[in-house]
């Protein structure tokens, strides 16, 4: 699991965070200053990258939050059998199996053996983002 920690105040919409062990994309962030002696708070709304679940989190802006390190690479589709897509990593030619549920909707109709796809590796899981 490759992650790093950043301050909540540095997050923006479109950033990625780890909430409850699930990598999520931030879709909304609200920062509010509380009273005279209180610290500012941030309310984060994020959507899970693998399960699509909506998660809400409220933290002080100076708190540390876990951010996944996303590794992007190109792979070639070797075969599609049922709900499993077998890929070959074009960097080191190792074989990877990705479930069909981890494929972006706009890429699903264009998958074919021999075509190249962009793959994101997030927290030791793989997601097919687009067909090249």
UniProtKB/Swiss-Prot annotation:
The gene is eIF5A. Functions by promoting the formation of the first peptide bond. HAMAP family: eIF_5A. It is found in: Cytoplasm. One of its GO terms (molecular function) is translation elongation factor activity. Gene3D superfamilies: 2.30.30.30, Nucleic acid-binding proteins. It comes from Pyrobaculum arsenaticum (strain DSM 13514 / JCM 11321 / PZ6). GO terms for cellular component: cytoplasm. SUPFAM superfamilies: Nucleic acid-binding proteins, Translation proteins SH3-like domain. Its main location: cytoplasm. The modification Hypusine is found at residue 36. GO terms for biological process: positive regulation of translational elongation; positive regulation of translational termination. Belongs to the eIF-5A family. PROSITE patterns: IF5A_HYPUSINE (PS00302). The keyword Heme does not apply. This is Translation initiation factor 5A. Keywords: Cytoplasm, Hypusine, Initiation factor, Protein biosynthesis.
